[in-house]
């Protein structure tokens, strides 16, 4: 995909500001390993896994998810300060970091490579930083309180940009130094490199300033960082957010769908099927036929009774109706189940195997099985100012936290 084809590139115009920084990162000692310090993003960690992570004194979750709710923001600040004072964290010279994740994608091994630096926050209406999903205000309020007290970015947003020249990519590969290597429970290998060559760092910033950036993951973190920047006008350090940027043509840029599971006591299965069939073109099929029939915006429906359907919608000229998450939201969740009126509960799961197991155990009234979102479609809609429904995309693997922090003091 070439972003320039959509009229985004403006020769000579200054767009994003992406810079190296003097990051603080784990100083492993006394037999410590990377696993003791890092974690998935705070919003995808279950309770049991959190207990395991927080059993390690210097794990990042002891900062991002402090349990003492009354004073947790202030205590997290004190904890971070103590890590710095004790040498548990060390500060680098100004650097970019290269984050490489090797993973299995449905039988194919892929490598996703991102550049980690600090990104200057801007209002969306400036047109340089592009969102693609709606966000939850409650989550943003919690993160803003943490940011105010910490004066540090502990977790990275994930962005997509056009890319760097092959010559610059080779320079990066030749000069980056491996600092961390870790394989997680899902079999994803994480490699973290430090790049401190001033000339190469300057060249990265120069090439990025003529590009725009799509937020792939971390809308809450970005919007929180922007609000924090607006609270601190004139403070340059506080106008930046920690960001991992991946080129749009990177072969490891994989997007999974996030399936919807519905629970309700307000409509029977028979009436729900009737309502959906009047709003969409449906065909009753076996589960195997449903799985093989998923394509474009043809979605699958699995009911508690075991009945399965394929459902389609004539999208017409409106590009939003080409997005099956939008069709599911408007025609099924809101249209039939009245989820926007509180008459149904919607939960989300990106792993089809997990959804299938839950439906076999009859845990939900309905599961809506969606297709892999197209990056091109996401770009096209984002460029015309469209926000997609929450949980439209699941970029796999997630960007892990704890490899490096950005302090704004």
How should these model regions be labeled?
Residues 2-409:
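Surface-exposed, charge/polar-rich loops and edge strands
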């Amino acid at each position: 995909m070439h972003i320039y084809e959509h009229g985004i590139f403006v020769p000579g115009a200054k767009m994003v500001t992406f810079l190296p920084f003097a990051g603080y990162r784990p100083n492993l000692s006394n037999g410590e390993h990377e696993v003791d310090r890092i974690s998935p993003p705070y919003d995808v960690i279950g309770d049991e896994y959190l207990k395991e992570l927080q059993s390690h004194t210097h794990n990042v979750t002891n900062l991002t998810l402090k349990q003492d709710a009354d004073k947790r923001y202030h205590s997290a600040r004190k904890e971070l300060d103590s890590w710095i004072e004790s040498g548990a964290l060390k500060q680098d010279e100004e650097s970019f970091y290269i984050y490489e994740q090797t993973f299995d994608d449905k039988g194919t091994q892929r490598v996703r490579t991102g550049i980690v630096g600090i990104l200057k926050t801007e209002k969306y209406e400036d047109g340089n930083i592009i969102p693609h999903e709606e966000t939850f205000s409650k989550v943003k309020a919690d993160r803003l309180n943490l940011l105010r007290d910490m004066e540090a970015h502990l977790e990275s947003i994930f962005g997509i940009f056009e890319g760097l020249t092959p010559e610059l990519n080779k320079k990066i590969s030749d000069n980056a130094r491996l600092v961390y290597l870790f394989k997680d429970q899902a079999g994803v290998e994480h490699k973290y490199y430090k790049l401190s060559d001033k000339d190469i760092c300057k060249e990265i910033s120069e090439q990025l300033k003529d590009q725009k950036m799509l937020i792939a993951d971390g809308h809450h973190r970005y919007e929180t960082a922007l609000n924090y920047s607006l609270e601190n006008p004139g403070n340059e350090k506080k106008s930046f957010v920690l960001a991992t940027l991946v080129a749009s043509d990177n072969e490891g840029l994989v997007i999974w769908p996030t399936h919807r599971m519905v629970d309700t006591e307000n409509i029977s299965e028979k009436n729900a099927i009737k309502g959906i069939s009047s709003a969409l073109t449906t065909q009753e099929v076996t589960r195997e036929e449903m799985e093989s029939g998923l394509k474009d915006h043809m979605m699958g429906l699995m009911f508690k009774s075991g009945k399965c359907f394929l459902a389609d919608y004539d999208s017409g000229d409106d590009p939003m109706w080409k997005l099956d998450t939008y069709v599911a939201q408007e025609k099924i969740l809101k249209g039939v189940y009245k989820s926007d009126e509180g008459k149904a509960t919607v939960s989300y799961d990106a792993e089809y195997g997990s959804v299938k197991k839950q439906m076999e155990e009859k845990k939900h009234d309905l599961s809506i099985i969606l297709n892999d979102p197209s990056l091109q479609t996401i770009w096209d809609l984002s460029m015309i100012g469209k926000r997609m429904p929450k949980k439209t995309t699941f970029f796999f693997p997630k960007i892990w936290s704890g490899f490096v922090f950005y302090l704004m003091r």
